[in-house]
Swiss-Prot record:
Alphabetical UniProt keywords: Cell outer membrane, Membrane, Signal, Virulence
Protein known as: Protein BptA
NCBIfam families: VirAssocBptA
Location of the protein in the cell: Cell outer membrane
Family from the record: Belongs to the BptA family.
Gene symbol of the encoding locus: bptA
GO cellular component: cell outer membrane
A Pfam match: BPTA
Length: 206
């Protein structure tokens, strides 16, 4: 019995190792989590693209949905006011996380989506909820100088910088139509980090 249990666990471990290795080899990780609390539903989908030959190590797309049935009726969705506006803004949220490894703390002063160079960009903190959040333009890159006092420092180890870009629903619909996602990040030191990958948004129905 012990031998059967041992070999069963060993087989599961081998399968898991193979699964994660295969995902990493393909440079793609997709995950979906559905949570229910009372009558409400929270859905979190993440798509991660790993890069090997660049200081830009990961692109993570996050789609978060909050469904509150009692607020979904037509009258509520058409009404105005802080409560209604906040729920409409937060019911579905789209975000990109760009993870850049350097020996410095970075700020990012610009993000350019090819084909939408004239997009309207806001640069306020990504804290939610807030009145600024409700006034989101095409996308928000946060305050590029929030860590300015550390920009001059260099470290003897890798610093994992994360830039979060929050996308409006309207802009998300635009980039979803692209065949390829071509994105350029520009740091506070004018260094460019470029992405050119197949557009995964339609494929995963995000």
């Amino acid at each position: 019995m012990r031998k059967i249990l041992f070999f069963g666990l060993l087989s599961i471990c081998i399968f898991l190792v193979f699964f994660f290795y295969k995902q990493k080899e393909n440079n793609i990780i997709y995950n979906k989590i559905v949570e229910e609390f009372e009558d409400n539903i929270f859905i979190d989908e993440t798509y991660t693209h790993l890069f090997k030959d660049s200081n830009l190590k990961e692109l993570v797309f996050i789609k978060s949905q909050l469904i509150i049935p009692e607020l979904e009726h037509k009258e509520m969705m058409k009404s105005t006011g802080y409560y209604a506006d906040t729920y409409r803004a937060l019911s579905t949220v789209y975000k990109f996380d760009f993870k850049v490894h350097e020996n410095k703390i970075l700020g990012f002063k610009s993000v350019i989506f090819e084909g939408f160079e004239d997009a309207k960009v806001s640069k306020h903190e990504n804290n939610l909820p807030s009145e600024k959040w409700q006034q989101l333009k095409d996308f928000n890159i946060g305050d590029p100088n929030i860590n300015e006092k550390f920009f001059h420092l260099e470290f003897p180890f890798v610093v994992k910088n994360t830039l979060r870009v929050t996308i409006s629903k309207g802009f998300f619909k635009k980039i979803k139509k692209l065949k390829r996602l071509k994105i350029m990040l520009i740091s506070n030191e004018d260094r460019e980090y470029k992405i050119d990958i197949e557009n995964f948004l339609p494929k995963y129905n995000l």
